[in-house]
């Protein structure tokens, strides 16, 4: 099976094909997320050893990380504490439930099923070392390391998250009642809401998937940013849990480990070949970008990037 050349023209074709799908809508349970252009559709690819290519159908603006930010405490804590300790706090099993499921935690707790669920990310945020401002500085350090630059927190989204995040509060209190929250509920949730409220441009989202694709090395300088062990574990979790109860469908269609967010960002990795980010705020009931999945599937087929292909 021959593959196409990776060109701007190919990316443009993928965007225009995705635009034909009018399903989904912006996430409205976090009110500020509804205030975006729902027709925005974009893709960027960083092939290892080559220049970045990107195409968007509308002017770009910063978009919040939402659940793509769950990669930050996962990777940071893996690097600092190691896998054995991290797996004392969360499991790494696909859940088959939605990203904010309380039932799953009640039935199969006290450990959350995996770090990509809200409960898992909240549990990991409670294990960030330090107290108060020290924990926020830890978060800023790892944001800068994983994005190769500083990012800002969108204050309106942060306030919106805090105002409407009652389900996440329920998860945090349930974790606390099961002795699996390592810090104060309110302080932990402030960290979690801040994590989701960092915002980035499309090109800024590319650094992390490119590093993961490159065995933890900076794609430009070759500097070892993350250990190979952390990359291996992170990619395995993305491949099995990155799109919640739609991960299996995603992997069958694309063969790319990925992590989605309800803001419309999805980052994806082709190990040894490329880092990818797609953006479209039209999400489905599972919290995944519909047009984003269309673009990733089209790119995988065009480039023969499915992991199961020789």
From Swiss-Prot:
It catalyses: L-glutamine + H2O = L-glutamate + NH4(+). InterPro entries: Beta-lactam/transpept-like, Glutaminase. Its EC number is 3.5.1.2. Substrate binds at residues 67, 118, 161, 168, 192, 244, 262. The keyword tRNA processing does not apply. GO terms for biological process: glutamate biosynthetic process; glutamine catabolic process. One of its GO terms (molecular function) is glutaminase activity. Keywords: Hydrolase. Homotetramer. NCBIfam families: Gln_ase. Belongs to the glutaminase family. This is Glutaminase. It comes from Legionella pneumophila (strain Paris).
């Amino acid at each position: 099976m021959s593959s196409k050349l990776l060109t701007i023209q190919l990316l443009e074709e993928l965007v225009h094909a995705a635009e034909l799908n009018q399903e989904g809508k912006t996430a409205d349970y976090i009110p500020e997320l509804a205030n975006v252009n729902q027709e925005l559709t974009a893709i960027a690819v960083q092939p290892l050893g080559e220049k970045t290519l990107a195409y968007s159908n509308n002017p770009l603006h910063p978009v919040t990380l939402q659940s793509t930010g769950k990669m930050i405490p996962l990777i940071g804590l893996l690097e600092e504490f190691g896998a054995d300790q991290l797996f004392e706090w969360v499991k790494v099993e696909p859940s088959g439930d939605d990203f904010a499921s309380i039932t799953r935690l009640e039935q199969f707790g006290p450990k959350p099923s995996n770090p990509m669920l809200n409960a898992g990310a909240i549990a990991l945020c409670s294990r960030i070392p330090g107290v108060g401002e020290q924990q926020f500085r830890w978060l800023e350090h790892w944001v800068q390391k994983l994005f190769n630059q500083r990012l800002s927190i969108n204050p309106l989204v942060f306030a919106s998250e805090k105002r409407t995040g009652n389900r996440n509060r329920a998860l945090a209190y349930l974790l606390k009642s099961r002795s699996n929250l390592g810090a104060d509920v309110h302080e932990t949730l402030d960290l979690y809401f801040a994590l989701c409220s960092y915002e980035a441009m499309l090109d800024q989202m590319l650094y992390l998937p490119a590093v993961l694709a490159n065995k933890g090395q900076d794609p430009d300088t070759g500097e070892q940013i993350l250990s190979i062990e952390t990359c291996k574990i992170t990619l395995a979790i993305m491949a099995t849990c990155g799109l919640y109860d739609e991960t299996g469908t995603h992997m069958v269609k694309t063969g790319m480990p990925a992590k989605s967010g309800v803001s419309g960002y999805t980052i994806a990795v082709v190990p040894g070949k490329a880092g990818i980010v797609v953006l479209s705020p039209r999400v489905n009931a599972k919290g995944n970008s519909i047009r984003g999945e269309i673009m990733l599937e089209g790119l995988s087929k065009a480039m023969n990037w499915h992991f199961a292909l020789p």
